[in-house]
């Protein structure tokens, strides 16, 4: 999703325009005067999780879309959803009906948990070509209304700032504990409005390492991860969690429950224990998979 403040200088965010944004934010057009109201939109979906469990896939599609709105400075309690569903073709085989049923149960569970409704959607149950089926798909789109001054962009801002990790609690079935999640998201909004958070990123299946890397690319800042961070956590799926950049003197004032996981540095490198990866190498590896499909360099001179 394109994410900039349409109609504002905030469309030019990070210096190198490499930090992927996670929410679209648009000012409302007015003929006279000035309007600081903005609309927001985000999405959530992971095909690998949904293939493993359509139920969990739908739950975390909703949760991820909420987390992205929260991370961008929105108020979760004002969110409304619209869902887009795609499933393999339904036949006389009753087992094929289990996927949409499980996914819709998951989405319903999340709506009840957050107390937020879906106001529409579109579905397709013909996602089969010969013997190829689409993965069970329920994409959640979250929409919200906010104030321009509360919007947070994801690129790292300054060396010396700390990186903190907000983790959402889950139950024994890996389902979010919604009451506690909403409390955390509410406190996160308090921190945003108080100016204690300067950049954020909602985590996905790729975990902390991917998130802080994308945050760093935009202004070519560096990141030093704390030695005591478990290496397994760096790449573990963390749907609903948020990483935030906080000025060092503001960390103790945070309302959220957090773990300090690193620090922003001026060096264009990622450091963890005795390992260091230059940002140039990381950026090249990140761009490589799609370079042949969508070249970032035309090869033209001048």
Enumerate the predicted regions with their spans.
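A glycine- and small/hydrophobic-rich beta-loop-beta segment
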Residues: 157, 162-168, 173-200
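Glycine-rich anion-binding loops of enzyme active sites
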Residues: 45-48, 78-171, 242, 246, ...
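N-terminal small/glycine-rich loop or linker at the start of catalytic domains
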Residues: 28-29, 33-49
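Conserved phosphate/anionic-ligand binding catalytic regions in large, soluble enzymes, centered on
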Residues: 15-17, 66-75, 155, 199-215
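Short, well-ordered amphipathic alpha-helical segments that serve as non-catalytic structural scaffolds
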Residues: 58-72, 103-106, 184-185
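Glycine-/charge-enriched secondary-structure boundary and capping motifs
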Residues: 100-110, 114, 119, 123-136, ...
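Hydrophobic alpha-helical scaffolding
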Residues: 14-15, 43-59, 72, 90-101, ...
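Single conserved hydrophobic/aromatic residue that forms the stacking wall/gate
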Residues: 1-7, 12
